[in-house]
């Protein structure tokens, strides 16, 4: 998002790809639409595929409004994207819309290679240890996910972190909706990071009202600046919380955040 549309366009055109796939989020959808339109004008025969929450739940409107979008995939794309690419490779045009399948997380491979790390040197890398969210906040697209909360195997998670540590990746951001929804699991992961990371910082989001004493204690013992924690309180207005299905204990949140901040070893970002 910090790159200019010109530099993004140039990089995409220079790659000379036949298919361009874009993951669309609230923070990048506008620039993706501009870039996709430009490269389609420059290379009319390419196939442009959109995925991600900002396209999946708004697919009908996007397909009607932007004719440079060839296909939209809603939901989890690991399985369906392979099928779509096979169709394209066979010289067939894919459908304009596909519904992704709920993926068995045990079947997924680690998404990064050594070459990726070299190409993404000094960049933030994203990693997930779980999918889904146990909460149903009215304003969040995660509330529309009916697949529930699912976890990647712990062996997969630890191998992933070891890869990041060995490559000295500066910052890994977890994209888990609520990292601490399973506190025992969160404690095991945090302990592994503390015991093995030498240069890598880890960022994750938590629900502060369900923080356990054990997880707070482990986080308080971490080396300074190893962890960055994001806490989405959103509002302290009780009526507003009720209206959006966030009936959380604000006093509990306040109490737990104070305990987390006491050692001054963790950077905490609290959203209001």
Model-derived features: where do they sit?
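Acidic/polar loop patches that form or flank catalytic/metal-binding clefts of enzymes
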Residues: 93-97, 201-202, 268-270
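Short, intrinsically disordered, charge-balanced linker/junction segments flanking boundaries
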Residues: 1, 18, 254, 262-264, ...
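Short glycine-centered, acidic/aromatic-flanked micro-motifs in structured strand/loop junctions
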Residues: 22-24, 176-177, 206, 272
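Short flexible/disordered coil segments
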Residues: 53-62, 87-88, 232-243, 266-272
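Radical SAM [4Fe-4S] cluster-binding motif and immediate context
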Residues: 110-262, 266
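Acidic, low-complexity intrinsically disordered segments
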Residues: 1-164
